[in-house]
Amino acid sequence: MTEQNQQPKTYCGFIAIVGRPNVGKSTLLNKILGQKISITSRKAQTTRHRIVGIHTEDQYQAIYVDTPGLHIEEKRAINRLMNRAASSAIGDVDLIIFVVEGTKWTDDDEMVLNKLRSAKAPVVLAINKVDNIKEKDELLPHITELSQKFDFAEILPISAQRGKNVHILQKIVRKSLREGVHHFPEEYVTDRSQRFMASEIIREKLMRFTGEELPYSVTVEIEQFKLNERGTYEINGLILVEREGQKKMVIGAKGQKIKTIGMEARADMERLFDNKVHLELWVKVKAGWADDERALRSLGYMDE
């Protein structure tokens, strides 16, 4: 075989992104991928599922696992399941990116770190939101202190929101990839279905427009997702809440809040799907769904 006919070597690997809730894991994944795949909002616990983001560049393919935030409280069924999903994500990967927030270090951060002590893969500590640190001279002593807690492969200050040092993080990721075939075609950015992405977009808008008023125990079920004869996606979304008061909160005065949520979600879907979308939303009270593992199974939060 001549040198011209030889195929270039390809590299592929799995990368887990872990950390306590609300440190910017989803924002980081979206920045790496160049588009919104994982739900982001200011409310903790907005990532429910292990969303796989796929970044292929030249001969390198990195498959990112965006975990729910590991956290200490496990009183509700949904919390236990989210912790289980996050813990399983770190079991069989080539690199772990542990995201923390600025100079903050909490009991939850310590708990995540303790879970990482048994991990086989190298761990990169990504100190996110460094642009928000008011006293910049506090960062270096904080890095020194963290470096004594664990044998990190790298410690890198970043700003996922602004993209600061994200390219350096991607170089570190590349070095961790093993020689092997790519698992996905080059154009893939996620293995999730359009139906799933539609539910995530609606849920993000719910979190964004209800602020801290609405608990994270709200979910979206896509009851219909079809392409009509005019080439438009017809999507019907059912928003499940636990109490009547939450239903009123989502609908808003004279239906204005749910109208805004629907308009914003539709615009995001049209950008993501590159297609016209007709979206209809309903709100239903289903008491105790976040405490019921059977209900969680039916909504796709756990494997059968």
From Swiss-Prot:
Localization (cell): Cytoplasm; Cell inner membrane
Region of interest: G1: 19-26
Pfam families associated with the record: KH_2, MMR_HSR1
Key words, A-Z: Cell inner membrane, Cell membrane, Cytoplasm, GTP-binding, Membrane, Nucleotide-binding, Ribosome biogenesis, RNA-binding, rRNA-binding
Entry GO MF terms: GTP binding; GTPase activity; ribosomal small subunit binding; small ribosomal subunit rRNA binding
GO CC annotation terms, alphabetical: cytosol; plasma membrane
Family listed: Belongs to the TRAFAC class TrmE-Era-EngA-EngB-Septin-like GTPase superfamily. Era GTPase family.
HAMAP family: GTPase_Era
Full protein name: GTPase Era
Organism listed in the record: Actinobacillus pleuropneumoniae serotype 5b (strain L20)
